[in-house]
Amino acid sequence: SGAVHFSFTKFSTSSSDLTLQGSALVSSKGSLKKNPSKKGKPVDHSVGRALYRSPIHIWDETTGKVASFDATFSFVSEAPAIPMLFPSSKGELNDEDDTRIGGQLGVVNDSYNVIRVTVAVENDGYRNRVDPSARPHISLPIKSVRSKKTAKWNMQTGKVGTAHISYNSVAKRLSAVVSYTGNSSSTTVSYDVLLNLAVLPSKVLVGKTATGLYKDHVETNTILSWSFTSKLKTNSIAD
């Protein structure tokens, strides 16, 4: 079987497993920051991305079998606004495009055309023209910035939260659960989808992105930890 596992309990600029783009940086305390502030003020028109260095094999071209995966982030949102994401994207993400606007999720262009094949879990504190009425919300955009499923999100600024994203390839279900330390309630959203050629290439990049447009609606996003596990079953005896 094809299994992948990685875990960042702290982040380091010397890590060869992590690719930082745009405004993303590692703090002196080992946390990952996207859209960090300058002189105490968040930076608008910015996008920060953190990607695992190697593409993940998400489905097998020969058998058509699809991987199951689990990803967990612990985070602190320091100002209400634009999204945190878990994207699976094809190809390199460069910094010289027009994906910096919040509604673009850091992966589509200014005309809202999908320029990279994307499956995302979005935690969004700001409502724009493609968003549902719920604000803040958690949603599942698939090959589009318009979400397939959405749930109202009880965003708690400055508190440590945990986002757990999973895909069950047997049930064909993509799910996200967000909760906060010391709070028994959580927000859950799920959508049934087969992550095959119709949705994603066989190998994808996994990571996290945060975007910001206006000065009053920029989320300074701190990631404390990130873990990911996937397993793609094949027809080998080892399975």
UniProtKB/Swiss-Prot annotation:
Keywords: Calcium, Lectin, Manganese, Mannose-binding, Metal-binding, Vacuole. InterPro entries: ConA-like_dom_sf, L-lectin, Legume_lectin_dom, Leguminous_Lectin. The keyword Manganese applies. It is found in: Vacuole, Aleurone grain; Vacuole. One of its GO terms (cellular component) is aleurone grain. Ca(2+) binds at residues 124, 126, 128, 131. Pfam families: Lectin_legB (PF00139). GO terms for molecular function: D-mannose binding; metal ion binding. Seed. Belongs to the leguminous lectin family. Binds one manganese (or another transition metal) ion and one calcium ion. The metal ions are essential for the saccharide-binding and cell-agglutinating activities. Homotetramer. Lactose-binding lectin. Also binds derivatives of galactose, glucose, lactose, and mannose. Binds O-glycoproteins such as mucins more strongly than N-glycoproteins. Shows agglutinating activity towards rabbit erythrocytes. This is Lactose-binding lectin-2. It comes from Cymbosema roseum.
